[in-house]
């Protein structure tokens, strides 16, 4: 007979009543895993561009009793009673979000950025309609028409790419594709594109072919809020985003628009079209994060994020690696490892072993398989939240280069602990608040 996997505090618990024990007493297995992850975050350098460190206030909201509340529907139009308090929270989130981005309508219920995108598709498209988005191989996102994603299965997906020499979006190619395919939806945005997007040009092309313009600003929303990245709000028909990444909130999504008719369709697509009850504890955490982003200090944070990423990218470039597009205008950079003859997978694993976390990433027109890649993606949002500045990012770049050279020379096993010690020393001066 298999041993019980039930938490110790529950194996002999009475069959009634809510367990009042704290997590460590109620479920040591989960508590240990969380404690170990806390240690990992404290002692490691986080360079994953889609990750960040939330405030204690955001964590507190996420862990509140709002997790107990069902609230299908929208404020003042719920299908359950007892919603006055969660209505107030959702109204706050909506008002703060619109204030933050200068939009008129907002839906804060999507559980993720992917579901925010799906809500737009459900609201504004029919199966088989044509969508035009950035190719995944050029830095796009799965939900913008990749064949393995529902967006590439339910719709006729056409992809535009980047110039093979500059790695910048080929706007003329995109315009030509738009004229030939007449997409119902034109998508701007991606997950590994390090340069500014020309929203005015996207708008011009969308108008020329009669397309709806959607901007997915999941990666750069916090930079828009901080005033260091152009806002898509004056140009796009509809905007989607996550609430984490550069916005430094809980994991979730939202949709913005200035069009009342689109807003009504989006609301119906989110509920009841895609989701049932919203996660009110997450919406509370979103409200907290939006409030934090409205503080003037957030503009300083956003400016430092971009400055730090440019320093990181330039130092890696000076150290002999290649940077796609030659640099960055935002919080992320894509590093081409081919000058060192190291794959993205090997680099990711080697760097994690010394305490630097990032992800393997395809470079434009990558000859390697998606699970191997020729590159890595680095980001500065999380480290900047810890307080890292340009000097720390120069040191981080040096640690990356030292590790990759050790991999190439076959000396990482001997060098690992010394490099790991220097990583711990660096982060010790910038403790997390939890």
Curated annotation (Swiss-Prot):
Main location: cytoplasm
Gene3D superfamilies given in the database record: Aspartate Aminotransferase, domain 1, Type I PLP-dependent aspartate aminotransferase-like (Major domain)
Matching InterPro entries: PyrdxlP-dep_Trfase (IPR015424), PyrdxlP-dep_Trfase_major (IPR015421), PyrdxlP-dep_Trfase_small (IPR015422), Ser_HO-MeTrfase (IPR001085), Ser_HO-MeTrfase-like (IPR049943), Ser_HO-MeTrfase_PLP_BS (IPR019798), SHMT-like_dom (IPR039429)
Residue numbers bearing the N6-(pyridoxal phosphate)lysine modification: 245
Listed EC numbers: 2.1.2.1
Catalyzed reactions per annotation: (6R)-5,10-methylene-5,6,7,8-tetrahydrofolate + glycine + H2O = (6S)-5,6,7,8-tetrahydrofolate + L-serine
Gene Ontology CC annotation, any one: cytosol
EC class: transferase
Job of this protein: Catalyzes the reversible interconversion of serine and glycine with tetrahydrofolate (THF) serving as the one-carbon carrier. This reaction serves as the major source of one-carbon groups required for the biosynthesis of purines, thymidylate, methionine, and other important biomolecules. Also exhibits THF-independent aldolase activity toward beta-hydroxyamino acids, producing glycine and aldehydes, via a retro-aldol mechanism.
The protein's name: Serine hydroxymethyltransferase 1
Native organism: Rhodospirillum rubrum (strain ATCC 11170 / ATH 1.1.1 / DSM 467 / LMG 4362 / NCIMB 8255 / S1)
